[in-house]
Design a protein with these regions (language model features):
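Methionine-biased hydrophobic packing positions in alpha-helices, especially
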Residues: 137-138
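Post-cleavage N-terminal segment of exported redox proteins
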Residues: 1-74, 120, 124-128, 152-199, ...
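Beta-strand-dominated extracellular/periplasmic modules and repeats
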Residues: 55-56, 61-71, 79, 83-96
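Surface-exposed interaction/gating patches
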Residues: 203, 209, 278-330
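Residues immediately within or flanking Cys/His clusters that coordinate Zn2+
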Residues: 87, 213, 314
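Gly/Gly-Pro-rich "capping" loops immediately C-terminal to redox-active cysteine motifs
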Residues: 78, 82, 91-127, 143, ...
Length: 403
């Protein structure tokens, strides 16, 4: 990208010498006003925590349950336990009799009727398990309004009927024996992986003049040489903005200050350019370090945010990718946080679209019923900063594919 009135700088150096890189620092790098992607849920969960705001109701203590529950309907309870539309269903995390692709994040409930748990205990554990375990992964189903009190009584009645260990006709239905299947696609084949086509678009944009009459190539003529390690050292802390910038936000702000192009984060142009630049670093070893007090503070905040409970379902990043890592939520395998970011942006087959790290973070929030933040949110930046360091030593593998 052109640097008007200054010596030509190789962009790979800018992550280390950020004050030398022209940046527009005042405007939002995200579309304004930010609105959720058109094909995502339109629901508003403003009564629950986001990565920025506190709104979720506090733990209310034990609920009163007098004697055995006699008005619960076990058939209704079973239907609720299997209903994916009501928060993912109990099957997302637990084995139940007759289940298809149950998860194993939580304990096997197929014999819970033999455990000797009282109705009071079962009711309160479903209503808000935090009264027993503050750090539980179990969503506060009643306290957060997913299920009514009557529905929870029905679910208790159903659980009390479960006294026989579950059996599976297909080994793939048993999460404790299920194997991860190898992908049927080849991400390195441009005919199979549409991300290569987006990288080609990024290459064209790299040589396309912006409103100021210059292109990225005007100053960075040898892209393959200049960018062979750049992506492996992003994100970086930008002292002029006192925040972390990743590749996509850097592209937005550097282009505005040089070529005059306005490639907003999550636009096709921005993602295509980011994909192209990362392909030039394909095979480079990721190496993000925290040396200054500011860098260490931002990384520490990212680590802290990964433990933050958000949304109506009250999940944290580390619930799924720490405590439950290498287990199954229904048919989805939960990978650990380590070595997760080297392939972004990637083509997500289930969505037929290119996904950046920020879109992935937004999606995780919406999946647990938390309102997402704009893609240039400093909270996401800190999380990506810390997460990328967990991939240190692995290699950039953009463009990739995933389901």
């Amino acid at each position: 990208m052109a640097i008007a009135g200054a010596a030509v700088l190789a962009l790979p150096l800018l992550a280390d010498a950020s004050p030398k890189a022209p940046l527009e620092t005042q405007k939002s790098a995200a579309p304004e006003p930010w609105t959720r992607y058109g094909n995502w849920s339109k629901a508003n969960w403003d009564k629950f925590n986001t990565m920025r705001t506190d709104a979720s109701p506090p733990v209310a203590g034990f609920q009163r349950v007098y004697g055995p529950i006699t008005d619960g309907d076990p058939e209704k309870g079973k239907k609720l336990a299997f209903d994916r539309g009501r928060g993912g269903s109990c099957l997302a995390c637990h084995i139940l009799p007759g289940a298809t692709l149950p998860g194993n994040v939580g304990p096997d409930l197929s014999t819970i009727g033999n455990w000797g748990r009282t109705d009071w205990w079962l009711y309160n554990y479903i209503y808000d398990a935090r009264v027993f375990n503050e750090g539980t992964m179990m969503p506060p189903w009643g306290r957060h309004g997913v299920y009514t009190e009557a529905e929870i009584r029905d679910m208790v009645a159903y659980l009390k009927t479960l006294k026989t260990p579950a059996t599976f006709k297909d080994v793939r239905d048993d999460p404790n024996a299920r194997k991860r299947e190898a992908p049927i696609y080849n991400p390195d084949d441009p005919f199979e992986n549409p991300a290569w086509g987006e990288a080609e678009l990024g290459e064209k944009l790299y040589s396309t003049a912006g409103p100021n009459g210059k292109s990225c190539a005007s100053c960075h003529q040898n892209a393959k040489q200049d960018f062979k390690t750049w992506a492996a050292r992003m994100p970086y802390y930008e002292p002029r903005m006192k925040k972390v910038l990743n590749g996509e936000e850097f592209i937005t702000r550097h282009a505005r200050a040089t070529t005059g192009a306005d490639y907003r984060m999550q636009s096709r142009e921005n993602t295509a350019l980011a994909t192209y630049l990362r392909t030039l670093a394909r095979g480079a070893v990721i190496n993000v370090r925290f040396n200054t007090p500011e860098e260490k503070a931002r990384a520490a905040n990212g680590r802290k945010l990964m433990d933050r409970k958000v949304g109506q379902l009250n999940f944290a990043c580390n619930d799924c990718h720490g405590q439950a890592a290498n287990k199954w939520i229904r048919g989805q395998y939960l990978g650990p946080s380590k070595n997760q970011l080297g392939h972004h942006p990637y083509y997500r087959t289930s969505q037929s679209d290119m996904w950046t790290v920020r879109k992935r973070l937004q999606w995780c929030g919406v999946a647990v019923r938390a309102n997402e933040l704009p893609p240039d949110a400093p909270e996401y930046a800190d999380i990506e900063y810390y997460l990328t360091s967990l991939s240190n030593g692995s290699k950039v593998s953009t463009p990739a594919m995933g389901h």
